Amino acid sequence: MPKVKRSRKAPPDGWELIEPTLDELDQKMREAETEPHEGKRKVESLWPIFRIHHQKTRYIFDLFYKRKAISRELYEYCIKEGYADKNLIAKWKKQGYENLCCLRCIQTRDTNFGTNCICRVPKSKLEVGRIIECTHCGCRGCSG
């Protein structure tokens, strides 16, 4: 994967508070990308990458929207630099999508019947004891 070019502009105030966590998640992402995939299905090798991407984006989202711990300028800097996924955050702000795992799970064009992923089905509508696992990202149910 090519190295992402970061802007030459200095980060806004407050960056030094969130930088260690983002660096730690970047390190986890690099480990997940280089992890051997022998013995796994093709789709299973991408699941850790999706989880870390979700974790990074949720971290930025919670800091800005829930805890109000970072400024709008720093939030926009994180989105512009690729630390958070703005499309996923836009979905999290909508009712019913607060716990969405990834954007692939709501794209209907990727399925045979034009429906959402199995992880978007509420647990109350599934059979009791049935364990589900999303083929896209490995989610076990993000609809509630």
From Swiss-Prot:
Disulphide linkage map: none
List the Gene Ontology MF annotations in alphabetical order: nuclear receptor binding; transcription coactivator activity
An example Gene Ontology cellular component term from the record?
A: microtubule cytoskeleton
Pfam families registered for this protein in UniProt = BUD31 (PF01125)
Which keywords does this chain's UniProt record carry? Acetylation, mRNA processing, mRNA splicing, Nucleus, Spliceosome, Transcription, Transcription regulation
Task: State the InterPro entries in the record.
Answer: BUD31, BUD31/G10-rel_CS
> Is Acetylation given among the entry's keywords?
yes
Give GO terms for biological process: mRNA splicing, via spliceosome
Subunit structure and binding partners: Identified in the spliceosome C complex. May interact with AR.
Give the function comment from the record.
Involved in the pre-mRNA splicing process. May play a role as regulator of AR transcriptional activity; may increase AR transcriptional activity.
Q: Return the domain comment text from this UniProt entry.
A: Contains a short sequence motif (Phe-Xaa-Xaa-Phe-Tyr) that can bind to AR and may modulate AR activity.
- Hey, which family's this protein in? Belongs to the BUD31 (G10) family.
- Record-given protein name: Protein BUD31 homolog
Organism for this UniProt entry? Homo sapiens
